Amino acid sequence: LTNKYLFDKIHKSEVIIKQILLNQKIIAGIGNIYASEILFASRISPFKKGKDLKMKEINRLILSIRLILIKAIRCGGSTIRNYVSSDGTLGNFQSNFKVYGKSGKKIANCIIKKDILYGRSTFYCPKLQR
């Protein structure tokens, strides 16, 4: 995943960045939980359209994608409800969540909000994510 690749895919897009991240044809492997965490880490609003992202935001986004996914893999993923891996172990990345599932909680002088976008829960900090 390179900055140029992502820029080329989204710079004319009217689609919001949260949906772009979930589109497996553009970037494979990002699910709903990780999309919220990645957008928070990169300080980008989930409602921002692809065409409105500046190159410095795309750079931050790609760095956040890499960091969040590497950390999640090292932690064995996120165990929500009854998921276990093939060897029976539970993932523990959920202990690293900054925003996902934390609606109403305060972080960095901001109250985490939850909205439903295209039928998916989206957690974000309106003050920090623009």
PLM segments and residue spans:
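Basic, nucleic-acid-binding surfaces and adjacent catalytic neighborhoods in DNA/RNA-processing proteins
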Residues: 5-130
